[in-house]
Amino acid sequence: MASTVIKNWDNKTWLSSKDYIKSFNKFLLKRIKLDRGSKILDIGCGRGKIIGNLSSKLMLINKPLGIDLTLHKDKDKRIKFKKANALTFLFKNKKKFDLILIKQTIHLFSFKEITKLLNLSKKNLKQGGKIIILSLDTEKNELPTFKLMKIKLKQSLKRDKKILKLITKLYPYKKNRFNFNVKILKNKYLKMIQQRYISTLLPMTNSQIKKGLDEIKHKYKSYIKFKDKLICLTL
């Protein structure tokens, strides 16, 4: 996996809220049929709340496995966690999965790594198993941004488009969209930016972040409303 580490994307944000997780897993289960005996791998799982909820919902016999470069002390207890590089893990792994979930993680890999990742993932699937990839909507993104963040996000989304083209060449897939209505306190969103909740913010200096926070303060009222939009590819 790429060396980029995002520690706070699912730490007390809408992405870790019960409503988001419930809505996302409802969407997910329309893409794939799973049951109590299903085996699940989440690549870039963060704290593992999504697959933890899925484990409870399906009453899974086997704990779903989440891998990430960061070991969080507050990880979900309903999952089995492994701190690992995804490519190394998939190369050495002997078990097969019904679902390999790659949610908002694939952009952290190089194009060469993405090809390896998908080829290895295919080899790690049971017969009839699926890879489900989610990334930011490249066309209709509504994430609240300040000027520099918007520029960097546009650059990142251009690269995401190239990733989608690469995946198109590698494997056939079904494309869907997942949208979630977000209403968040401005102060809470400011804290998320301060904690660099998205990879676009990681290279920025503290002064650039501070300037961006001031822009957001003046740009939005006490609450910020938008749709968090993701593209979903089912391989």
For the regions a language model picked out, list residue spans one by one.
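Conserved class I S-adenosyl-L-methionine
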Residues: 1-36, 49, 53, 132-158, 196
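Class I SAM-dependent methyltransferase SAM/SAH-binding core
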Residues: 41, 46-89
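A conserved beta-strand element that flanks and buttresses the S-adenosyl-L-methionine
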Residues: 101
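Short catalytic micro-motifs in class I SAM-dependent methyltransferases
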Residues: 104-105
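A short glycine-rich, Lys/Arg-flanked "PGG" loop and its adjoining helix->strand segment in the class I
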Residues: 115-127
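Short alpha-helix
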Residues: 156-171
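Conserved Class I S-adenosyl-L-methionine
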Residues: 174-235
